Amino acid sequence: MSKIIGIDLGTTNSAVAVLEGTESKIIANPEGNRTTPSVVSFKNGEIIVGDAAKRQAVTNPDTIISIKSKMGTSEKVAANGKEYTPQEISAMILQYLKGYAEEYLGEKVTKAVITVPAYFNDAQRQATKDAGKIAGLEVERIVNEPTAAALAYGLDKQDKEEKILVFDLGGGTFDVSILELGDGVFDVLATAGDNKLGGDDFDQKIIDHMVAEFKKENGIDLSNDKMALQRLKDAAEKAKKDLSGVTSTQISLPFITAGDAGPLHLEMTLTRAKFDDLTRDLVERTKEPVRRALSDAGLSLSEIDEVILVGGSTRIPAVVEAVKAETGKEPNKSVNPDEVVAMGAAIQGGVITGDVKDVVLLDVTPLSLGIETMGGVFTKLIDRNTTIPTSKSQVFSTAADNQPAVDIHVLQGERPMAADNKTLGRFQLTDIPAAPRGIPQIEVTFDIDKNGIVSVKAKDLGTQKEQHIVIQSNSGLTDEEIDRMMKDAEANAEADKKRKEEVDLRNEVDQAIFATEKTIKETEGKGFDAERNAAQAALDELKKAQEDNNLDDMKAKLEALNEKAQALAVKLYEQAAAAQQAQAGAEGAENAGSTKADDDVVDGEFTEK
């Protein structure tokens, strides 16, 4: 069975891992980094992903960041003169990760386990699965990020039972999960979170502070300047990271804008104390989900054995202190917060292929599911933190006499009124026989699969008529749209491949021209006129093809030049070898003469007096 890669598709950074033997290994990207920025930019028709895209974010307006925050919505992003769905942009990131995983493995990759925040709703999970499909990946499993982290942490600790709390604060989302580990079973007891809280929010607090201070000093509002804002974002992210290791950092942005008197520079010092003050409300928001998860799991703090920190934002000292204060425990530092989720996803891939034995993952649904009933009430069928996969049925009836149809409004959330929860979808069961209200029996069944994706059916128990849908929110893509996007992605991949081949060819041509010119110069006056002239003629022809920008001609002329240059190099080598041999012969004769002279030397004894 082919390898199943594990992918952590993050808001700010992503990572890919694979199982090698019994160990999960992070695959470094082409730049040698173990995580890849979740950034996509477009330039001259080319799609650029990762570190290169992030580097040009300041100057390239066609750069898209933090697309994960838009997953599951109908919002589109404009770039490159087009509009893209969040699924398409995410697919470009996935395609890049898939590409360098294939380079590393030396084989085609078609299957993946992709992680999502535990608190992602159905629409967001479906969007993630669609992104995988567009990227040419069969998504074998969607796994919650804290659960994946627990897998990576606990794989070598199966001999002991323990309850762990996973505190996962990433770039754009926050989750808390409580799991029970023992005998190879990873049982999620409860999960809670906030999909609108992450490292980006901490960056924004610094940006707002810089904008306010600059306006106070110079009377100019930088928040209206797109290029200045991107520079502020980069500086804020760097300052945040610096303050994890030092208590004060200098922010210096020369020529940030211009005033009446000329260019203006932003220079300021940010202390950790000020940063903590700016972000106090964000840190405070992490506490309630911890308490809720513990309450839902029916556990007290004393029953938690370990606290695992996941996500780059857990390096913020104030966050670490808040976790300590809230749990009364020193967090476990045995896992890398940036890599552990992808590693856990790869382990789940190994469970699916059978490479990892005796491991069972029991995850939960993060939010309650139900339907709208009379009076706009939200009636739950499946409570949050129910182990998945699961199925639940309940019988309802009509609200009016002779009602011919019922509308099924499917919702996800925790609020008592339907209007306050997230709509997953609507469908209708028709042709209900005329009867007084309350008589027809309509059975509604919810199914949640192992990926947390919902399907619902409604059945008239009198007529046995049934209506069934897999939930597709207004942000969902049709099969036709996914197919079209897959074709676009394949075409882009082919175009990228051609572009790379073209760049490689141009580099080879430049290298060949340089090397041949050097060899021709070195062989001047050494008697290889025929070979030198042939190499020079081939060199001139290649230069002409280069000027004409004819790629096919360049390829043919490059081969011809390599052949002539090689013939010249052989002559040069032969001459050097002959000279070396002659020199060795001369030295041998000289040494022989020296030995003969040595025969006249008489040995004597030396006595110390």
Curated annotation (Swiss-Prot):
GO MF term (any one): unfolded protein binding
Membrane-spanning intervals of the chain: none
InterPro entries, A to Z: ATPase_NBD, Chaperone_DnaK, Heat_shock_70_CS, HSP70_C_sf, HSP70_peptide-bd_sf, Hsp_70_fam
Phosphothreonine found at: T173
Protein's job: Acts as a chaperone.
Family, per entry: Belongs to the heat shock protein 70 family.
Protein known as: Chaperone protein DnaK
Taxonomic source organism: Streptococcus sanguinis (strain SK36)
Lineage: Bacteria, Bacillati, Bacillota, Bacilli, Lactobacillales
